Amino acid sequence: MYKLFRKTASSKGNVVENFTEEKNLDNLSIISDNPITLLKDDTLGRAEVSQSFAQQILSLDTRSGIVVGVLGPWGSGKTSFVNLARNEIKSAGLTILDFNPWMFSGAEQLVESFFNELSAQLKLKTELSELGKELEEYGEMFSGMAWVPFIGPWIERGRGTVKIISKVLQKRKEGVGGRRKKIEKLLRDLNKNIVIVLDDIDRLSTSEIRDIFKLVRLTANFPNIIYILAFDRVRVEEALSEQGIPGRDYLEKILQVTVDLPAVPSQVLAT
């Protein structure tokens, strides 16, 4: 049973009805648990649902950004589902960026890598290179270096370090707000959406999961940005729970659209 739920209106102002779709998994043959990328490789009958999901993504009102969750337990095929939807989204002309936080560790490395990875992918496209540069510099304002309380010992490291310090201080003077406004303008001027996919979130440590969601909240309301986050709801809710506040409450404040995938029966997974 697939459950697709949305809390926001489409770009046309119409609320899309919630729906569920049943698929019979009893007669499936043994399959590999490696993620698929092509519709022809879909043996779980998820192609149709993934295409419906992609169409909904394309209809979203993204003037203030939006965050979408693809939720399911380990082995439910979240990555494959996103890959199938990705093809439909790409064919509509949207840019898709990927960030896998599992490849990095620690709060500072996650922050730095998040902005660096996204900006690097943007710079590969001529029409997005300026946005990539601005996003990279925006990210540097949140790295540890940008908030060093003193600079004295750095002076001894030479002129290169002095230039770096001057650059950092200038960014601080300009302020996060000013840099953010530049990015928002560039995104609006693009007049098309950018999709950012974050996978394997549930493989992170508790502190890293919290850091990732802080990063998402930091940039979630950028115009024309769609986040697609794939994770195990139970694991992430557990990580986000703190001081008696349920993690589900935290998630509901972030996610505007969710799709819940059922677990794949063990008899259809390769041994």
What does each model-found stretch correspond to?
Residues 255-271:
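Conserved small helical "lid"/interfacial subdomain of P-loop NTPases
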Residues 118, 243, 271:
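Conserved AAA+ ATPase "sensor/coupling" helix adjacent to the nucleotide-binding pocket
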Residues 82-189:
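P-loop NTPase nucleotide-binding core
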Residues 74-75, 103-107, 232-237, 263-268:
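Conserved nucleotide-binding/hydrolysis micro-motifs of P-loop NTPases
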Residues 1-104, 112, 219:
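Walker A/P-loop-proximal flanking segment of P-loop NTPase domains
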Residues 67-75, 97-101, 196-203, 228-231, ...:
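Extended hydrophobic secondary-structure segments that form protein cores and membrane-embedded regions
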Residues 175-232, 238, 242-245:
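Conserved Walker B catalytic segment
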Residues 92-96, 192-193, 222-226, 250-257:
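Short glycine-/polar-rich loops that comprise or flank the Walker A/P-loop
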